[in-house]
Curated annotation (Swiss-Prot):
Its main location: endoplasmic reticulum. Residues 1-18 form the signal peptide. Keywords: Endoplasmic reticulum, Glycoprotein, Signal. This is Endoplasmic reticulum protein SC65. It is found in: Endoplasmic reticulum. Residues 81-102, 387-443 are annotated as: Disordered. It comes from Rattus norvegicus. InterPro entries: Collagen_mod_leprecan, Leprecan_dom, TPR-like_helical_dom_sf.
Amino acid sequence: MARAAWGLLWLLLGSAGAQYEKYSFRGFPPEDLMPLATAYGHALEQYEGESWRESARYLEAALRLHRLLRDSEAFCHANCSGPATSQPRPAPGPDGDNEGDGEDWARELRLFGHVLERAACLRRCKRTLPAFQVPYPSRQLLRDFQNRLPYQYLHYAHFKANRLEKAVAAAYTFLQRNPKHELTAKYLNYYRGMLDIGDESLTDLEAQPYEAVFLQAVKLYNSGDFRSSTEHMERALADYMTVFARCLAGCEGAHEQVDFKDFYPAIADLFAESLQCKVDCEANLTPNVGGFFVDKFVATMYHYLQFAYYKLNDVHQAARSAASYMLFDPKDSVMQQNLVYYRFHRARWGLEEEDFQPREEAVLYHNQTSELRELLDFTHMYLQSDDEMELEETESLPEPEKPLSDAEFEGEGDYEEGLYADWWQEPDAKGDEDEAEPEPELA
């Protein structure tokens, strides 16, 4: 009944257009608002019934609703993540100070006081945003959207609706997160062959702002324009850190509770689920270039900066970039030699000891990611059990119900399958020459 009601509401709407057009998580049109599960479920029903245009319309609406929820969660948690405005004061011990059990009790009380304040802040924030006025989606549904599964259905729906340009964009968007998915790669090559589309025309509908800036910085680096390259790379680095912080904040949204547990195990379950999401942020935000994810993405940006600043004779920044890189790859012998070289000539360039310290944002990022992984490893080692907690493994993506038949490929010829960027080069003298590991092959 509820689904029918939402469906009637949606039928009153005009064409949705691209999923992110005129998007605002603060002022989302009330008439466009519906539960994510409702929009996506109806899209799949229409897909099964071969109502391709209607299916595509609801899939785009679902993608838009998912972004609304993701951005709204990140906004509220980022705005409520500051230090507590007031904290309970520890009760004094018999002699006026806090020792032993009293100190532990006081520390725990302060912690939960901060939790309560943050919960109140989140409640106030979410009360004002459209995304939280409808039922919250399940964890599995959110995982499907994180893996870009809707684009598997969307590209084929667009193809059957004779919207080849949109089919290309949807298929390419899915492959940017799932580059080893052979069937979707076959679809994309088929669509590109029909339209004669080159690599430069491919669009990732979920691309982050730093990705294009990073690629432009690499192109400028390879052309020898080191000044412009450093400007673009610094911007890409700053943009990435902003998106990474937003990703961490978005991992603290609503969580399903499926059984009854003691107080602390229940808290540990929720915290471990949030930890897994935060650890995944690093991989989920890594750009895909030519079908491969950029290995050690943040470290790679510092490596480019190190060499570009050196070529610009800005050795102060070059040394700090080298030290920042070493946080992520301390065994890189070439970078070790670079730092030795800078130290040997420190008098010549007027370098101080602070010039050999990593940059602040690099230290923060390294500490965050390292500590998150350590905590997650602890939960895997000591908290995971059938009775206490299950940290779910990533599931293989299911295939859409309507695959292309061999007949649809007959007579079209072979099309180029390589998506490699010809201009991509590693930085000069990079010590780590290992290729980026591809994602596990999906079903």
